[in-house]
Amino acid sequence: MHWQTHTVFNQPIPLNNSNLYLSDGALCEAVTREGAGWDSDFLASIGQQLGTAESLELGRLANVNPPELLRYDAQGRRLDDVRFHPAWHLLMQALCTNRVHNLAWEEDARSGAFVARAARFMLHAQVEAGSLCPITMTFAATPLLLQMLPAPFQDWTTPLLSDRYDSHLLPGGQKRGLLIGMGMTEKQGGSDVMSNTTRAERLEDGSYRLVGHKWFFSVPQSDAHLVLAQTAGGLSCFFVPRFLPDGQRNAIRLERLKDKLGNRSNASCEVEFQDAIGWLLGLEGEGIRLILKMGGMTRFDCALGSHAMMRRAFSLAIYHAHQRHVFGNPLIQQPLMRHVLSRMALQLEGQTALLFRLARAWDRRADAKEALWARLFTPAAKFVICKRGMPFVAEAMEVLGGIGYCEESELPRLYREMPVNSIWEGSGNIMCLDVLRVLNKQAGVYDLLSEAFVEVKGQDRYFDRAVRRLQQQLRKPAEELGREITHQLFLLGCGAQMLKYASPPMAQAWCQVMLDTRGGVRLSEQIQNDLLLRATGGVCV
């Protein structure tokens, strides 16, 4: 018997086979403006590949098939390994092929390589975010290791700089590509790493014996981890490889994988060091200094990753609104919905402008002024963007309605993924305290801000008023106001970039919406049209 109760209609088809790069006008402009226009053709190519149904399916598969801890083999021998779904390995292979883990560190890296790498990172993050964890840690650790690789591991340089992903369980020197992890957090300390109890004792050959634990040990399958441990000289940073120079496994015991809210594809582990061997990087007592050198880059990636997921959520929402009809018209033509989507697009415009200005600062960090710019605005961007992500994705869910709340949609996974970047590499308060530390202790920071804001002074009254408000707060920056100061600093950083590079009507609209404390701003029809055109590559208007 043939059953047919109804015909399915007015249900949008899934967003597959789109170009993640060319559909994002703000990103395309920022890449060229900030010095990586030479990578545009390649970005368009990988944007097309990553936007396919096949790539998006890999992201889904990697999350519904989380990693599995293998502590013992069938005979009871320790394995201390992690098994991943094949989709994970394909995602990692694509990331390494596209050099998201080391583009800026190649010997012949071009000017703007940090900017190009940021764009590549952002495109991959829209497909699957968990696989970016090993990539960002490897990216941050590589420049330090290129300077400080211990003598027994000098043959690691070539695989560190390769474009290969190698998941084989082998010593690093025998592999075609390497991953580096970090181990800092302990049960009692969290962000307070000075309270770490893991001890390191120097041995006769110059290596150290480590005894202790780590509570969150990301990517336990990495070829080595940079680990904080206490020495006679204070908290220090150690290179702790998975395999020792003689080919034996190091004494790193994998105890349990974390059962996390999101980030399901990525393995986060509890580990114990039972006389593990490590090699000191730098001097005893320099652990915090070395970790902070890497922490700035991983914090930047947190902000970039959250922004990318916001961009993906917005793309799903506007694509749905373009196809779905209500009351006889496309949802995107309904005045209130069009205004909501336009404001979401405007928010992404400002974030894109600031993030890629930050990427340029990281690219030119040899210049003291650029390094200071990155030092100040990186924690500010991480604080604000990572916090914005959750309500932003929830707003995108509302555009789709009930179907956006179902697991068949990408949005539940994006929503669960969002909180991790607010926590990883320092939660919100840590970011705000870091901003205050820069404002209170870094010479030249007020001159830097003055120069950035004076450059666009007089172009918008809301911006000028917000600058004066921040100046008053900075006369005596109280710790209790750290969040407000950080948020205001971030907004002014975005506003300065918008006033400098966006069209005057769009820049002024951004300043009024984001900086007018009275609220109730209505975007003009022309601004809405421009925003939605730029946000979709001219498709959904």
Swiss-Prot record:
Alphabetical UniProt keywords: Cytoplasm, DNA-binding, FAD, Flavoprotein, Oxidoreductase, Stress response
Biological process according to GO: DNA damage response; negative regulation of DNA-templated transcription
Triggers of expression: Regulated by Ada in response to alkylating agents. Also induced by anaerobiosis or by acetate at pH 6.5, via RpoS. Represses its own synthesis during normal cell growth.
Co-factor(s): FAD
GO cellular component, one term: cytoplasm
Keyword DNA-binding: yes
Residues bound to FAD: 182-191, 216-218, 423-433
PROSITE patterns with a match to the protein in the record: ACYL_COA_DH_1, ACYL_COA_DH_2
Keyword Glycoprotein annotated: no
Protein function: Part of the adaptive DNA-repair response to alkylating agents. Could prevent alkylation damage by protecting DNA and destroying alkylating agents that have yet to reach their DNA target. Binds to double-stranded DNA with a preference for a DNA region that includes its own promoter. Shows weak isovaleryl-CoA dehydrogenase activity in vitro.
Family that this chain belongs to: Belongs to the acyl-CoA dehydrogenase family.
PANTHER family from the UniProt entry: ACYL-COA DEHYDROGENASE, ACYL-COA DEHYDROGENASE AIDB-RELATED
Name of the protein this chain belongs to: Putative acyl-CoA dehydrogenase AidB
The encoding gene: aidB
